[in-house]
Amino acid sequence: MKISAALILSSLSSVAFSAPAPAPADSHHEDHHKDEKPAVVTVTQYIDSNAATSTVESAATTTTLSSSEKDTSEQKRDGGFQDGTVKCSDFPSVNGIVSLDWLGFGGWASVMDMDANTSSECKDGYYCSYACEPGMSKTQWPSDQPSDGKSVGGLYCKNGYLYRTNTDTSDLCSTDETSAKAINKKSDSIALCRTDYPGSENMVIPTVVDGGDSQPISVVDEDTYYQWQGKKTSAQYYINNAGVSAEDGCIWGTSGSDVGNWAPLVLGAGSTNGETYLSLIPNPNSNQAANFNVKIVASDGANVQGSCAYEDGSFTGDGSDGCTVSVLSGSAEFVFY
């Protein structure tokens, strides 16, 4: 059995996981600390046929901090971002970016420096991480990352203005693979909360699927997306109970709240070597059953291997502790009912 697994490399209470990957490398220790809120790191990890936990190593991409001079021009609204033109006190207004007003950080997902210090405002010397629309991922993070295994991401605040940390692109958000979506057949909306990664790892980036509606799932290309110490990473979502709003559910929750990092299920999505892997696992922070059922099904004409469903509080696919499917062609759907 192959199944997604959580890899925790520092004390934390959120779960980080990804899909099966094709070739093994070195192993890592897994640990959970429910009552602490530290930084989190993730890698692509799986359990092979011999029950050996493995990770896949790959070369990390190189990014540099722009040295563009600031000017007095206004924020661009055509999807491109110009360094040194937007004040750190202003949240950018470009295509794809989403303001998270309920967090109290001026719209940012998190604000951190290299020493893991945090701030409630984007200010000099800090990395200001941001959310993108469903089906998109942020493009900005520095190639130099903290040596202790934590991560930072977003735009950099310098001399009162914002600068890209990846000058290879002027788009702050990029469209992910289109091989998965969520369909909600219930009447209440369902808030799927993606982790802010690289960054705080808090589950604050919302994909809200209204009753009778659908939304894309961010399937990141693990071969080109952020890599932690040379290891591939994927997207992860905490799935709140139906009826919980983004403002109430896409937060760092508290014990017994059943929201945020205490939500009942975790969803993983990633693509590597041309194959998409989609997973569902129970959140080890929660022992409460979800108030919905969910299954992963193939879209018309798709080639999907494996089965995965969560019904009446139990998994009915490839394993009792979660399940994974691989999409060889076409796309798959997380159907909530």
Swiss-Prot record:
Localization terms from the record: Mitochondrion
Region (Disordered): 57-84
Comp. bias intervals (Low complexity): 57-67
Name assigned to this protein: Beta-glucosidase-like protein NCA3, mitochondrial
Record carries keyword Transit peptide: yes
Annotated GO CC locations: cell surface; fungal-type cell wall; fungal-type vacuole; mitochondrion
Keyword Acetylation: no
InterPro entries documented for this protein: Beta-Glucosidase_SUN, SUN
Basic and acidic residues bias: start-end ranges: 68-80
Main location: mitochondrion
Keywords noted in UniProt: Mitochondrion, Transit peptide
Family note: Belongs to the SUN family.
A single BP term in Gene Ontology: fungal-type cell wall organization
Function: Involved in the mitochondrial expression of subunits 6 and 8 of the F0-F1 ATP synthase.
